[in-house]
């Protein structure tokens, strides 16, 4: 792979960090140094915000909607032209299976297309008021948006935040996770090549705490859009409250997967493993708590475990691979801590939970070549835990790894209490062929995104976000664009 992005992207050009600091990136599939990238400082963050403010005042905020749409459509086209390059970059950077990486780059391009088309439909309204006259509303851009994105879906989430913010007439300072900055840097470069003016989209790789705090507290930043852990989201809210800065937060999850006996439970059992193990479980929407009606529990578990054992875990560069490594050694260690606690509690493991390595170009069961090096990579077998005590950490806390807990239920009302006792409320699935039950349970589950007889969580056209400690505000759909605008009311007397 040639010419990896290695610097900050500010004012339409790459430049070194002011301190010349650099960070090392590790390929999680090989445990080898992949590349180095510049690490921004708070001073770099301040400079990027001030540059973005100048770009906003200098013309982006007032650019004709049709011209803004033209640029966003152009960004979508250039992203599709570079899809394979970006997918390979993501695969090497975070161990994302190459087929998933391609899908995610395509999703990012689709997001830009959607918001390019939305620009001409984003407007206020006229309002009849009691005293007569003319009353109407305007949707106006906010200014500089700080977008802080995670390492698990770095490219699509960067697009989820940048595209609607740009479409609404804002400028964006994008802070990718320190583990996964490369596709974000290319996004900035390609967007500029597609016609986005200098300073409208800045990209700052670097340490999350220092750069994030600098962005959140900068007086010119009008809104912070963050996806990541609940703990960091709480910290951002505290900082933003000092000057009443707007925030939107997409945080943790402990999503339920509810399977009733009248459902097509065989299909649910076949498809449910990937609803929790996809992306090696590093997904805030992972259906990590499975509730199965007791009459089908044993048969469901048998089929679920069989489907789990068939998953292809291995080298993410291979087309057939479904699950790659965890993103880092520390992330694997964190997941293993949960599994160790479960073992100490006497939890039953139906399968998985062990560490293994994968030789280059090999699969899960491949042997290293004769005389070769030991297997490498931050791999962990998908773990299926049964009859889990609801007081354990594995049941209560977000693991962010390939671990699922399955329990039986007898009573719908008690099951719903167990579902909703979680402090999280992001996503979930309900499996039943009874439409009345499906709608009743969907209304009762305290989650922002639910699917019935499906595991789908994300649609570009629909709002995405959670209840409770899973966050506030919404990504995607027209709701996201509204969240990047100010609503102004104007009254004209007769």
Residue ranges and their predicted role:
Residues 34-40, 57-61, 147, 257-260, ...:
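Short, well-ordered beta-strand elements within core beta-sheets of diverse protein domains
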Residues 16-17, 22-23, 38-43, 263:
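A short acidic/small-residue loop/turn micro-motif
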Residues 32-122, 132:
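Glycine-rich loop-to-alpha-helix module at the N-terminal edge of alpha/beta enzyme cores
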Residues 1-29, 55:
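Hydrophobic face of amphipathic alpha-helices that form TPR/SEL1-like repeat modules
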Residues 123-267, 409:
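Rossmann-like NAD(P) dinucleotide-binding subdomain of oxidoreductase/dehydrogenase enzymes
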Residues 31, 68, 90, 112, ...:
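Residue-level signal for inorganic ion chemistry
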Residues 231-360, 365-389, 452:
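ALDH superfamily catalytic-core signature
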Residues 30-36, 221, 258, 312, ...:
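Conserved C-terminal structural/oligomerization subdomain of aldehyde/semialdehyde dehydrogenase
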């Amino acid at each position: 792979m040639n010419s990896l992005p290695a610097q900050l992207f500010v004012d339409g050009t790459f430049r070194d960090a002011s301190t010349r600091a650099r960070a090392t990136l590790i390929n999680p599939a090989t445990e080898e140094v992949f590349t180095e990238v510049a690490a921004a400082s708070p001073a770099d963050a301040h400079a990027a915000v001030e540059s973005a403010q100048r770009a906003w005042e200098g013309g982006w905020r007032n650019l004709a909607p049709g011209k803004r749409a033209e640029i966003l459509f152009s960004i979508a086209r250039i992203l599709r032209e570079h899809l394979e390059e970006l997918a390979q970059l993501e695969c090497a950077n975070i161990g994302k299976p190459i087929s998933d990486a391609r899908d995610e780059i395509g999703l990012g391009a689709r997001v830009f297309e959607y918001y390019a088309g939305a620009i001409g439909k984003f407007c206020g309204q006229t309002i009849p008021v009691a005293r007569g006259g003319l009353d109407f509303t305007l949707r106006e851009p906010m200014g500089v948006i700080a977008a802080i994105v995670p390492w698990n879906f770095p490219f699509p989430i960067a697009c989820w935040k940048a595209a609607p913010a740009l479409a609404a007439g804002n400028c964006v300072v994008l802070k990718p996770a320190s583990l996964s900055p490369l596709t974000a840097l290319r996004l900035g470069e390609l967007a500029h090549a597609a016609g986005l003016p200098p300073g409208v989209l800045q990209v700052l790789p670097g340490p999350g705490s220092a750069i994030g705090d600098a962005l959140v507290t900068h007086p010119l930043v009008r809104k912070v859009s963050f996806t990541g852990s609940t703990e960091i989201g709480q910290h951002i809210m505290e900082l933003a409250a000092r000057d009443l800065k707007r925030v939107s937060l997409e945080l943790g999850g402990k999503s339920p997967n509810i399977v009733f006996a009248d459902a097509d439970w065989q299909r649910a059992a076949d498809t449910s493993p990937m609803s929790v193990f996809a992306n090696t479980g590093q997904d805030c929407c992972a259906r990590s708590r499975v509730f199965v009606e007791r009459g089908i529990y044993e048969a469901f578990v048998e089929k679920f475990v069989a489907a789990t054992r068939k998953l292809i875990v291995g080298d993410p560069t291979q087309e057939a691979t479904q699950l790659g490594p965890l993103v880092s050694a520390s992330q694997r260690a964190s997941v293993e801590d949960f599994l160790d606690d479960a073992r100490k509690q006497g939890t039953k493991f139906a399968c998985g939970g062990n560490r293994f390595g994968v030789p280059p170009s090999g699969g899960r069961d491949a042997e290293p070549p004769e005389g070769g090096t030991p297997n490498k990579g931050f791999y962990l077998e998908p773990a299926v835990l049964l009859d889990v005590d609801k007081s354990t950490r594995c049941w209560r806390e977000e693991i962010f790894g390939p671990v699922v807990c399955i329990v039986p239920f007898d009573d719908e009302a008690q099951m719903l209490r167990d579902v909703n006792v979680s402090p999280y409320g992001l996503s979930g699935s309900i499996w039943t062929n009874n439409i009345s039950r499906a709608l009743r349970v969907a209304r009762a589950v305290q989650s922002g995104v639910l699917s019935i007889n499906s595991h789908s969580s994300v649609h570009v056209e629909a709002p995405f976000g959670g209840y409770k400690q899973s966050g506030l505000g919404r990504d995607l759909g027209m709701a996201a664009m509204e969240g990047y605008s100010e609503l102004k009311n104007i009254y004209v007397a007769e």
